[in-house]
Each structure stands twice: as C-alpha cells, then as structure tokens.
Regions:
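Conserved N-terminal entry element of GNAT/NAT acetyltransferase domains
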Residues: 1-16, 179
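Conserved acetyl-CoA pyrophosphate-binding loop and the N-cap/start of the following alpha-helix
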Residues: 111, 115-123
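Short loop/turn motifs at secondary-structure junctions and domain boundaries
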Residues: 49-55
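Conserved GNAT-fold acetyl-CoA-binding loop/helix
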Residues: 23-48
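Conserved acyl-donor/pantetheine-binding loop and adjacent beta-alpha core of acyl/acetyltransferases
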Residues: 55, 62, 68-112, 127, ...
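C-terminal "cap" of GNAT-fold acetyltransferases
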Residues: 134, 138-145, 151, 157-179
Length: 179
C-alpha cells in the first residue's frame, strides 16, 4: 500500500521530531558519500534553524502522524546551518538582487527516494517566487546533489566548511532561476 503524503508549515511543537529525523537523515543518507568521521562532523554544520519555523517558511511532509521529510526556504542571508552553527546571518535579502535560500532539506531514511525532496523544493520555489525572488540558492550535501541537479539546479562553487573536530565537510553551492 502506498503512503499518502500531505504537507504543511512546521510548528515549534515539531522541533523534537524534526531533530530526530535530521539526525537519522545525516547519519544514514550521507554514509554512502562521506567517510564516517565526516558524517559525524556534519552535525556541526547541519541541523534545524528555528528561524525558518518562526518566519513561516519551513515545511513538513507527513504520512499520517509521521513526519517523513522537511525543508524550507529563507529570505535571510544564512545559506546553511542550524541554530548551533557559527556565522549565521539573519539579515533580510533583497528579492530584486539576491537569491532566496533553500534550507535544511531532510528526508527520513525509510522515505528516501519517494519524491519528498522534489515536493518540498517545489513548495520552496513557489513561495520564494511569490515574494518576488527570481533566483534560489542552496548548499547541497554530496547526497543531495543528484536531486538538485535533476530539479534544475546548477553548481556555482564547491567548498569545504570547517567543523570543531577539524574534519572539513564538502558542500556545493547551487542555484536556479525561478522567475
């Protein structure tokens, strides 16, 4: 039997479940792309940015009462990272010149490769376009890059980000025109 998926905006009450989902996603979905120490180091630079929930720009995808995936977009300057990540910037972007950010895309491992990422990306792109943004950018993990390429995102730059352990985590800044 196929699961029926619905989506809605995330609420603060979802935070505990989102943190569990994100941890499982990082641990399981990155392991085919990164060395074990880089997977663990990824927790330093990935996770939930609750500003997205507060801004009303973070979506959850559910089946029944289970959150199967999540992700959002932002009108703020931060490109990636959770509440605990250094160098976050809450400055508002100008849709006339800046790209909106797609942020914190995660799928619960049992629901991977079932179209949830594509669904959330579409929701993010529609919402950003409705606010006047003509472009979106994101920081892709190695595991996420194939999805983003398939959805029309092009690499802008490859980079590595520092972590507390000294292990550098590879990411790819990617972008797409939406308007």
């Amino acid at each position: 039997m196929n699961a029926v998926f619905t989506h809605r905006l995330a609420r603060r009450a979802d935070i505990p479940a989102l943190n569990v989902l994100m941890a499982a996603s990082i641990r399981e979905l990155l392991r085919d792309f990164l060395a074990p120490e880089a997977v663990e180091a990824s927790f330093d630079v990935m996770g939930l940015d609750t500003q997205l929930i507060d801004d009303g720009t973070y979506f959850v995808v559910e089946t029944g009462d289970v959150i199967a995936g999540c992700g959002g977009w932002s009108r703020r300057a931060t490109l990636f990272g959770g509440d605990h990540t250094a160098k976050r910037d809450a400055a508002l972007l100008d849709p006339r010149q800046d790209a909106a950010r797609v942020r914190a895309m995660y799928t619960s491992p049992p629901f991977a490769r079932r179209g949830l990422g594509r669904l959330v990306l579409g929701l993010c792109e529609q919402a950003a376009a409705a606010e006047g943004f003509a472009r979106v950018e994101l920081a892709a993990t190695m595991a996420g890059e194939p999805l983003y390429r398939a959805c029309g995102y092009a690499p802008i730059e490859r980079f590595e980000t520092d972590t507390r352990s000294g292990v550098r985590v590879p990411l790819i800044r990617m972008g797409k025109r939406i308007g």
